[in-house]
Amino acid sequence: MTNEESGKGWTVADIPSQVGRRALITGANSGIGYYAAAELAHNGAHVLLACRDKAKGDAALARMRAKDPRAKAEVVLLDLASLESVRAFAAAELALGVPLDLLINNAGVMAPKKRLETADGFEIQFGTNVLGHFALTAMLLPALERAAANYSQRPRVVTLASIAHKSGQLNFDDLQSVKSYSPMGAYRQSKLADLMFAFELDRRLRAAGTPVSGVMSVAAHPGVANTNLFQVGEFNPIEKMVRKGFGVAIGTLLNTEEQGAMPTLFAAMASGATDGGYYGPQGFQEMRGGDVGPAAVAPQALDRRAAARLWRECESLTGVSLL
């Protein structure tokens, strides 16, 4: 197996030219999303920085262009916690009539202390991390199909999961955490759902035939990266003790944002990434590490019956059909 196929030794220097490709990244104003967007633009892609806050998006774009004046990027407004916003954005994007080569479902909400709701009344983590991205992917599929009909590099949907999925469970009787809310429990459920979505999307794309079968579904996780999500989330007692015990030094135990972005970049651009693949850092417990490789998958993420049920739930809750 070559380095390109395994991810071992793969770096940003191995990214193929992205000239002519159009990429959309949600949550691109900071953290992993920003670094993935910057690398895509640096390698020639036209990047859409999908942000819910225009000021933060503009600041990210200015930062990107200060580092690389040639970067082709623009800020687009998208709030995944509002299906109305998702519909409006997707309608405007499809009206352009241009292909979309890459969709990175990166934005996320992590473990708010109190149960919060989206504009549509969903628990905010499930509503944003899962339902918002499900609806966005469904609505943008025609643009991805356009790219699939005539591609040099196959169009891809990359969905960000997490090592937290390993301890996640889908509670179909209370997906919105109305009866009982645990900040990290709801987060783990959302990340398990994201990974199951990526796998089920892969199966359905390949079963659909051309041109849609030309679209790849890939997943990635950043390990434990020192991003805004990690800094503001509510953690379980063990995680709290670790943070308190290590204090500032905990930063040395985590992936930087740049390191955390590597699995996403591999999933999005490496020729060695495969249909239905799931990639993460290869250090201790996949929490950190420079090399990228296939990530461990919890048994519950491979439950096809549960994945099909989750799919139906997502279609019902969003009012959007997908494959």
Language model regions located:
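Rossmann-fold NAD(P)H-dependent dehydrogenase/reductase core
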Residues: 2-239, 317-323
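C-terminal helical subdomain
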Residues: 190, 244-295, 302-308, 312
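Short coil/turn segments at secondary-structure junctions
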Residues: 120, 124, 181-185, 248-251, ...
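Pocket-edge positions in alpha/beta enzyme catalytic cores
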Residues: 49, 78, 252, 299-302
